[in-house]
């Protein structure tokens, strides 16, 4: 069976699944099975903290049920309209919801855009000038990018009376592949990202088309779809993927490649321990200096006082299972559950 036949059979099966969907979120998740979307790309490229190419493959090959992210979908969809409205007020642009778009020549590459950006209303003859991706984030944590620390959501755009005067593309790196994918599919030259952080702060960014990255995305996406999805061949697994596999006990004899990797890992672990020891010494010295304070500030280059660090007690509510077992032993037994844990890698 050639790839075209496999695609047609696949599409027919997805259509049968759609007929069984009971709500909007299930329908949305099932429609995503028709191809690769922007939110899949970071994982396929190996640049996602949360998912791997193997995770995406399991979903696209029907090994994992769709509709497991309903709460995230419902919450994100509800806030999307709020973020989009504030974007309009800040920028002066007009945004409209958009239908999905299949890339010319690659119908399995599908852009499900949050919004398309117009220079004015459609009634006034407005034209599409860009796209908009709406995001929400609980907090703006620190990350390492190219060896340097920065906020996950960096300095954002600056607007003066709805005019963009300073551009920034310092978005969460997880989403760079997504917006580049959308520009590749649509042919648009820029995509704005609007994010609501902690339900209290809105930031806006502009990302321009990167042809080199888009070519990498295209190559990876086509290969993943044809070689892995349609031919039903799993992509290379990460260690996290391998841990989740349930395998019967069996033994392999180490070859040169395995021995080389194990020895390389040992060398890295030694270096890691040395760094951790050095880090502990620095933290102990720092603790001695700030032990009597809960917050430390500094003055930046602009003369503004900023928070450098906080050192506060955190409250955590947890379930006391031991006390519950002592007071309600029979009820405790009723709720015991035995599960198989992920595989644990140990070295000897």
Task: Show which residues each predicted segment covers.
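Nuclease catalytic cores
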Residues: 72-80, 84
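N-terminal, Lys/Arg- and Ser/Thr-rich interaction peptides
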Residues: 7-67
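Short, charged, low-complexity amphipathic alpha-helix
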Residues: 173-176, 205-273, 326, 348
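Extended, charge-rich alpha-helical segments
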Residues: 121, 132, 270-348
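Nucleic-acid nuclease catalytic cores
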Residues: 73-74, 89-113, 117-225, 229
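A short, surface-exposed helix-loop junction/capping segment
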Residues: 57-72, 244-249, 261
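Short, hydrophobic/amphipathic alpha-helical patches that form generic packing surfaces
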Residues: 36-42, 55-59, 180, 184, ...
């Amino acid at each position: 069976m050639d790839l075209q036949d496999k695609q047609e059979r696949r599409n027919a099966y997805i259509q049968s699944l759609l007929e069984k969907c009971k709500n909007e979120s299930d329908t949305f998740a099932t429609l995503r099975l028709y191809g690769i979307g922007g939110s899949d790309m970071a994982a396929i490229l190996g640049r996602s903290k949360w998912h791997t190419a193997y995770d995406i493959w399991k979903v696209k090959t029907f090994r994992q049920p769709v509709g497991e992210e309903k709460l995230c979908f419902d919450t994100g969809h509800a806030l999307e309209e709020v973020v989009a409205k504030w974007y309009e007020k800040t920028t002066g642009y007009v945004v409209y919801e958009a239908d999905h778009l299949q890339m010319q020549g690659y119908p399995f590459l599908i852009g499900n855009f949050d919004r398309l950006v117009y220079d004015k209303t459609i009634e006034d003859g407005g034209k599409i000038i860009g796209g908009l991706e709406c995001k929400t984030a609980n907090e703006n944590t620190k990350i390492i990018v190219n060896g340097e620390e920065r906020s996950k959501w960096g300095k954002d755009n600056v607007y003066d009376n709805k005019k963009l005067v300073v551009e920034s593309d310092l978005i969460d790196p997880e989403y760079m592949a997504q917006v580049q994918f959308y520009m590749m599919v649509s042919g648009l030259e820029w995509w704005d990202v609007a994010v609501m952080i902690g339900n209290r702060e809105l930031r806006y960014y502009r990302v321009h088309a990167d042809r080199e990255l888009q070519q990498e995305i295209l190559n990876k996406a086509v290969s993943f779809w044809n070689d892995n999805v349609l031919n039903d061949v799993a992509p290379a697994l990460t260690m996290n993927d391998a841990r989740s596999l349930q395998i019967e006990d069996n033994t392999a004899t180490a070859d040169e490649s395995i021995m080389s990797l194990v020895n390389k890992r040992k060398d890295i672990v030694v270096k890691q321990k040395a760094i951790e020891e050095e880090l502990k010494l620095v933290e102990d010295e720092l603790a001695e200096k700030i032990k009597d304070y809960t917050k430390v500030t500094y003055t930046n280059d602009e003369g503004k006082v900023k928070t450098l660090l906080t050192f506060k007690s955190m409250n955590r509510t947890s379930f006391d299972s031991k006390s519950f077992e002592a007071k309600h032993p029979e009820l405790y037994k009723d709720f015991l559950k035995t599960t198989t844990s992920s595989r644990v890698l140990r070295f000897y």
